UniProtKB/Swiss-Prot annotation:
Is involved in the reduction of 2,3-digeranylgeranylglycerophospholipids (unsaturated archaeols) into 2,3-diphytanylglycerophospholipids (saturated archaeols) in the biosynthesis of archaeal membrane lipids. Can fully reduce the unsaturated isoprenoid side chains of membrane phospholipids and glycolipids. Is also able to reduce the omega-position isoprene of dolichol phosphate. A 2,3-bis-O-(geranylgeranyl)-sn-glycerol 1-phospholipid binds at K343, A379. Pfam families: FAD_oxidored, GGR_cat. InterPro entries: Dggglyphlred_Halo, FAD/NAD-bd_sf, Geranylgeranyl_reductase, GGR_cat. Its cofactor is FAD. The keyword Electron transport does not apply. Binds 1 FAD per subunit. This is Digeranylgeranylglycerophospholipid reductase. It catalyses: a 2,3-bis-O-phytanyl-sn-glycerol 1-phospholipid + 8 A = a 2,3-bis-O-(geranylgeranyl)-sn-glycerol 1-phospholipid + 8 AH2; 2,3-bis-O-(phytanyl)-sn-glycerol 1-phosphate + 8 A = 2,3-bis-O-(geranylgeranyl)-sn-glycerol 1-phosphate + 8 AH2; CDP-2,3-bis-O-(geranylgeranyl)-sn-glycerol + 8 AH2 = CDP-2,3-bis-O-(phytanyl)-sn-glycerol + 8 A; archaetidylserine + 8 AH2 = 2,3-bis-O-phytanyl-sn-glycero-3-phospho-L-serine + 8 A. It is an enzyme of class 1 (oxidoreductase). Disruption phenotype: Reduced pigmentation of cell colonies and lack of fully reduced isoprene chains of membrane phospholipids and glycolipids.
């Protein structure tokens, strides 16, 4: 077993797995270090709702075999309304998806080391040259990539990670069977992915039901402990309590039962990234962070960050001098903002405003969605300041002012 590689990747999630897949396909010597054991992977990191769309499926050639259910629509709910829109998608079996990434990279020659907990970088001359794991084990490479998510042991050691606790979103998800997907008074969620804005269920966040076929669905709650959460939270409630409260009060769960062993927990940070690279090093995926701030979609963004990191590494290692300096790898930062998360500042600002709005305002938002043209909705969702401004009402001025105040003070 060699201890010198072209690239070391810490973490085998969607970002790390895709980076390994692309680099191995290009013929580089790649080593992936993954904390979990091979037999259990990914039992402790199986934390994604795993909803995605055809653009992602096609861009990364994700096979149908890892899809639980193909969906036809997306649904947005408020406390008293719902909005349907035709948007084909797919709900993945996340564990199968992550194992597929491993198989793809290994088939092209990548080496995976499971039971390998990364602890800190190996430094020479002020630059990272390798990784220490499992206490005293060492491995070296020209380029090191941190794809470990919020734990970020390498990025933190290199002072590239400023993940803030107050920007951390936490989520919990169960899988249910026996669901009633279309009771009276509710939209039909058959073959749909639904997000619900309702502070009674998810103060400062959202809840979801993703149909996974038959009478089964993924059901979860996610929120940030933000201004919206502080203003609307129920005293003493944990995130588990909110999910239980929802499932006990919503008729869609009247005859539903949790599927044993199908519980997922996780967290991600909803904030602007800082610098993402330095000499011989890049941080990708939720280490950065990368999840879409508005709707929480992470698979596409993380895989794209892995892909642009792989492209950056390919460029640096193809150079006859193998230039992996900070100035060369800074191309990754540029590609991230151009291709992974364009207009991320606008989407973050819109997200912070959204979660400060009241339940009554959520009902009015859905009224607007029913009457506004698709072109305006697409532009607003894409982060267009003009389209976003045109959706504001007079009552939103106080939310705009408070969000702007906090935005610039932080």
């Amino acid at each position: 077993m060699t201890d010198n590689y072209d690239v070391i990747i810490a973490g085998a999630g969607p970002a790390g797995g895709q980076a390994a897949r692309d680099l191995a396909a290009r013929g580089y010597d790649v080593c992936v270090l993954e904390t979990e054991s091979e037999d259990e992977f990914p039992s402790r990191s199986n934390k994604s709702t795993a909803g995605t769309f055809p653009s992602t499926m096609a861009s990364f050639n994700i096979p149908d075999e890892v899809v639980m259910n193909f969906t036809d629509d997306v649904v947005l709910e408020s406390p008293n309304d719902h909005y349907h829109r035709h948007q084909p998608g797919a709900v993945l079996e996340f564990a199968d998806f992550k194992n597929w990434l491993v198989d793809e990279a290994e088939a092209d020659g990548a080496e995976y080391r499971f039971d390998a907990r990364v602890s800190k970088p190996i430094m020479e001359g002020g630059e990272i040259v390798g990784v220490r794991y499992n206490g005293d084990e060492e491995v070296y490479a020209d380029i090191v990539i941190d794809a470990t998510g919020p734990s970020a042991p390498l990025a933190k050691a290199l002072d590239l990670c400023d993940l803030r606790r107050e920007k951390q979103a936490i989520g919990i998800e169960y899988e249910f069977e026996g669901m009633d997907l279309a009771p009276d008074g509710y939209g039909d969620l058959t073959d749909a992915m639904m997000l619900r804005l309702d502070h009674d269920i998810a103060p400062g966040g959202y809840s979801w039901i993703f149909h996974t076929g038959g009478d089964t669905a993924k059901v979860g709650v996610c929120y940030i402990q933000n201004e919206g959460h502080r203003h609307n939270a129920k005293s003493g409630y944990t995130i588990d309590d909110y999910l239980q409260y929802w499932t006990e009060s919503d008729p869609r769960f009247a005859d539903a039962e949790r599927i044993a062993g199908k519980q997922h927990r996780g967290s991600a940070h909803i904030q602007l990234p800082g610098r993402m690279s330095t000499d011989n090093f890049m941080a990708i995926g939720d280490t950065v962070p990368t999840v879409d701030p508005l709707w929480g979609e992470g698979i596409d963004k993380c895989m794209r960050s892995g892909r642009v990191a792989a492209a950056t590494a390919d460029r640096a290692l193809t150079n006859s001098e193998r230039d992996t300096s900070a100035s060369e790898l800074a191309i990754y930062d540029q590609l991230w903002h151009d291709r992974v998360a364009p207009k991320v500042k606008n989407r973050l600002f819109m997200t912070e405003m959204l979660y400060r709005a009241s339940n009554e305002r959520y009902d009015k938002l859905l009224e607007d969605l029913h009457r506004l043209p698709d072109e305006q909705l697409d532009a607003a969702n894409g982060g267009s300041p003009l389209a976003m401004f045109r959706m504001l009402k007079f009552e939103d001025l106080s939310i705009l002012a408070s969000t702007a105040k906090d935005w610039f003070s932080n």
